[in-house]
Amino acid sequence: MASALEQFVNSVRQLSAQGQMTQLCELINKSGELLAKNLSHLDTVLGALDVQEHSLGVLAVLFVKFSMPSVPDFETLFSQVQLFISTCNGEHIRYATDTFAGLCHQLTNALVERKQPLRGIGILKQAIDKMQMNTNQLTSVHADLCQLCLLAKCFKPALPYLDVDMMDICKENGAYDAKHFLCYYYYGGMIYTGLKNFERALYFYEQAITTPAMAVSHIMLESYKKYILVSLILLGKVQQLPKYTSQIVGRFIKPLSNAYHELAQVYSTNNPSELRNLVSKHSETFTRDNNMGLVKQCLSSLYKKNIQRLTKTFLTLSLQDMASRVQLSGPQEAEKYVLHMIEDGEIFASINQKDGMVSFHDNPEKYNNPAMLHNIDQEMLKCIELDERLKAMDQEITVNPQFVQKSMGSQEDDSGNKPSSYS
């Protein structure tokens, strides 16, 4: 092994033993070029370091190995990274979260290129757990995990990292990019859409769209298109975006989504035949955007919406009559829709098979059972927790030096602008 590499190994051992992690981070940041020049010796360096005791040194070597234009032996490197992420020291890693996250991004890209996304899911879950200070902290690796789960069509492993509300972002020594934030909410929205959890999907797309921005992001544009479609499926109309949404959404993103706005406009007429014509007219756009499946669900949701409207007018109705009023192909299709809607709790009805009549009923829920009271208690606890968190954030801002300086400056401006009472 070259003497410079020996010195690197000795320094890593010494600084790790002394617990001087900040100096060790400085060393590994400076050593990238040295390690890159000695690629053939890097496995020897790995052999001289202990993954648990010298985690930052091993991280530096693996990062450089993965950074090379071509990886000569991917399987060996994959095994080394897998072993490292599962056994490394989490406390040490948190000093170099930028490099650790970078290694995870490299692994993700390599698996995506090789069309092997499933292999990385378990590894990235371990990586997130090592990086996070708490379960409500968002890291850039969350987006990688969601991407692999989407490509592998294996959604459930991502849910524990999506079902929690994020309160904090891991700064990753300044390396955290807005792209990772947008991708987490965009991919998360797609996962929830695939699982038909449309309420949560809508929230995730909204987070991506309302991210403060000065320029158009392609991720925001695609989120906006899906936001319109999911909004129609879930609510029967496009939910208005919050007032704090960036102006670029109205100025640039909306004009780039004309086909989707037309779809929403026609949807509001409650006319399925017109909606089918519009879908046919813009089918190329919807297919190119990979949104045709959602568009078809919009058409299906319009039939359901029209059936729900019938429940407000009729107590009983024949399946044949329902099919003609809702523009379905016949009583069989009407029966299929009604049964699905009863199963999903969207309507309360029963079908008499003898005469093909549908009887609509009132909602049997009286909101007085223990389960409902428990739900109300849980929602109240969430509100109390949110109130406490807002108070803590308010206090944090109040004592922030930048905020104090700015508020004092504005007060001085105000007092300077006031006319003197003696003039």
From Swiss-Prot:
Which residues are modified to Phosphoserine? S407, S410, S423
Q: Where in the cell is it found?
A: Cytoplasm; Nucleus
Which Pfam family, giving just one, matches this sequence?
COP9_hel_rpt
Which InterPro entries is this protein grouped with?
COP9_N, CSN3, CSN3_C, PCI_dom, WH_DNA-bd_sf
Where are the membrane-spanning stretches?
none
Superkingdom, natural source: Eukaryota
Summarize the record's disruption phenotype note.
Answer: Embryos arrest after 5.5 dpc and resorb by 8.5 dpc mainly due to increased cell death.
Q: May I have one GO cellular component term?
A: cytosol
What's an example Gene Ontology biological process for this entry? Answer: regulation of DNA damage response, signal transduction by p53 class mediator
Residues forming the PCI domain are 197-365
Per UniProt, the keywords (alphabetical) are: Acetylation, Cytoplasm, Nucleus, Phosphoprotein, Signalosome
Tissue expr:
Widely expressed.
What is the protein's known function?
Component of the COP9 signalosome complex (CSN), a complex involved in various cellular and developmental processes. The CSN complex is an essential regulator of the ubiquitin (Ubl) conjugation pathway by mediating the deneddylation of the cullin subunits of SCF-type E3 ligase complexes, leading to decrease the Ubl ligase activity of SCF-type complexes such as SCF, CSA or DDB2. The complex is also involved in phosphorylation of p53/TP53, c-jun/JUN, IkappaBalpha/NFKBIA, ITPK1 and IRF8/ICSBP, possibly via its association with CK2 and PKD kinases.
Official protein name in the record? COP9 signalosome complex subunit 3
Record organism: Mus musculus (Mouse)
